[in-house]
A protein has these predicted regions:
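Short acidic, hydrophobic short linear motifs in intrinsically disordered regions
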Residues: 38-52
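Conserved alpha-helical substructure of the radical SAM core
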Residues: 56-203, 207-208
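Radical SAM enzyme [4Fe-4S]-AdoMet core and its adjacent flexible, acidic
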Residues: 63, 221-237, 244, 248-351, ...
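Radical SAM/AdoMet-radical enzyme domain recognition
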Residues: 135, 139-155, 164-288
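Short Fe-S-cluster ligation motifs
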Residues: 139-157, 394-396, 432-476
């Protein structure tokens, strides 16, 4: 399968299954578009009609171009066969090794964000803080079910996890003890709204957290529209100075500023640029997922505006990078030479199998977005996964589980998309959230274009970097099995 598009002056041709990316001139772009369904003579005739007035386009040149395309096809870099579909059906037989937990240490929050999917941190239930006993058992559950995997991921989540900070510190200390006993390596992430950040929090996170996610929606008026406290006061003035101090002290350790855009700020690139201008360089901005009819929900009329915004963002990122003031955007971070291995590209995030969420009471759910839905209660941290039907359902959830994805060029980049978004949009985890698909495909086009621009600049310096699918992923490089 081949996908062709034009963006920022580049003619880009992507071969889906090999991962090869080709940057071609106008003539080659049109030849590739006709190649599969036309004879060489038909292609030459059509191209001469279109480009015949150009002195640099002759029939001989066109036939050479066709031969070059044929060579790429024979080399498996254009219209390469899809040899991965059978792998998708093997996943149901894989042993279930748990690699990561989203630990809901607080089902309460000190903000009252009206667009919050978790009903202001309560997940449509009672407010609660996780006890150390539950947290300790959750870590034991993870160790017991991780098999030979050494690197384990834990995300302290809420609600607002800093409302249970003392327990978090105690739990991390316990995990550090268990690492030595079981030959494990815990990588912690903290997701916080920033209100309770102080020197103690900063020092702890910079010592113990592999990554930190800091919630900010961008410009003051945008952030404060939704991210308010219970007295109705916006959080921007409170959290921005704290985030700046946090990031300054964090040095070269991982962090992300994470925002949400809604119908009210479809010009969300201005919020990203605002965060960059505040000094933040690791940025993410996610589309809100709301019920239809919600005032914040994205509409069909918003879609072309949003796609244009992603293009504006990509072009500005290239410009700022050349000026020495670049920043990272999470959804544009792709590695086209050594990225995720094919098992990961097919199976996605691993929710419901390798990754689960744990409530303050120790219940297990496929991920944080299913918490509180009795249909997706999988078991608990004492008895383990008892609702194996849910786990089996998620084992089948992959890039080949949806018939609509069969002929989609982006399927090996999205892995079939987010199961939770599909469920909330269609009622099925193997449904298709079409709005999200459109945004994802535009993000991928922009991300690939940025890589093309980077490679063009390297080529100008005499450095050639081929863009095609690598054979290993970061997990493999860490000595972990992806299968």
């Amino acid at each position: 399968m081949v996908h062709q598009y034009q963006l920022n002056g580049y003619n880009i041709v992507l071969d889906t299954c090999s991962g090869s990316v080709h940057v071609v001139d106008d003539v080659a772009y049109d030849v590739i578009a006709m190649y599969q369904d036309h004879t060489a003579d038909q292609i030459v005739s059509a191209m001469m009609d279109k480009y015949g007035s150009r002195p640099d386009v002759t029939e001989e040149d066109l036939r050479q171009c066709i031969d070059d395309v044929t060579s790429l096809k024979e080399a498996g870099k254009l219209w390469s066969p899809d040899v991965y579909e059978n792998m998708a059906f093997d996943f149901k037989n894989r042993s279930t090794v748990v690699k990561a937990l989203c630990l809901h240490v607080a089902h309460t929050c000190n903000l009252s964000c009206s667009y919050c999917f978790a009903s202001q941190g309560r997940y449509h239930g009672d407010r609660a803080l996780m006890s150390f006993e539950v947290g300790k058992r959750a870590m034991d559950f993870l160790i017991e079910n991780s098999g030979t995997r050494r690197n384990l991921e834990v995300d302290f989540f809420g609600g607002e996890p800093l409302m249970n900070f003392d327990m978090v510190k105690k739990l991390v200390a316990y995990c550090r003890e268990q690492e030595k006993i079981h030959n494990k390596n815990f990588r912690f992430t903290m997701t916080t709204n920033g209100v309770l950040i102080d020197d103690d929090v900063i020092d702890f996170c910079n010592k113990e957290c592999h990554n930190v996610v800091l919630s900010l929606d961008g410009r003051k008026e945008v952030n404060d529209r939704f991210r308010k406290d219970y007295a109705g006061r916006g959080s921007y003035d409170t959290i921005v100075p704290k985030f700046q101090e946090f990031v300054k002290k964090r040095g070269d350790k991982n962090y992300y500023m994470r925002g949400t855009y809604t119908h009210y700020n479809t010009d969300f690139t201005n919020d990203i640029f605002h965060m960059a201008d505040l000094g933040f360089t690791e940025l993410s901005m996610e589309p809100v997922v709301s019920k239809p009819g919600d005032p914040s929900a994205l509409t069909a009329e918003d879609l072309p505006i949003l796609k244009e915004q992603y293009e504006i963002l990509a072009k500005e990122m290239i410009k700022r990078d050349r000026e020495g003031r670049g920043f990272t955007f999470y959804h544009y971070m792709i590695d086209l030479t050594g990225g995720p291995c094919i098992s990961t590209r097919i199976s996605g995030c691993g929710s419901g199998t390798e990754y689960m969420a744990v409530t303050p009471w120790g219940d297990l759910y496929p991920c944080h977005q299913f918490v509180g839905d009795p249909k997706y209660l999988m078991g608990d941290i004492w008895k383990g996964v008892t609702n194996t039907a849910v786990r089996d359902e998620f084992k089948h959830c992959n890039a080949y589980a949806r018939k609509e994805c069969k002929d989609c060029w982006a399927k090996l980049y999205c892995s079939g998309g987010c199961a939770a978004n599909s469920y909330h949009a269609t009622g099925s985890i193997t449904g298709v959230y079409e709005y999200g698909c459109e945004l994802f495909k535009k993000r991928m086009e922009c991300a690939i274009m940025i890589k093309v621009a980077e490679n063009q600049e390297l080529a100008a310096q005499g450095i050639e970097v081929p863009i095609e699918l690598g054979s290993t992923c970061n997990a493999c490089a860490d000595g972990e099995a992806c299968e």
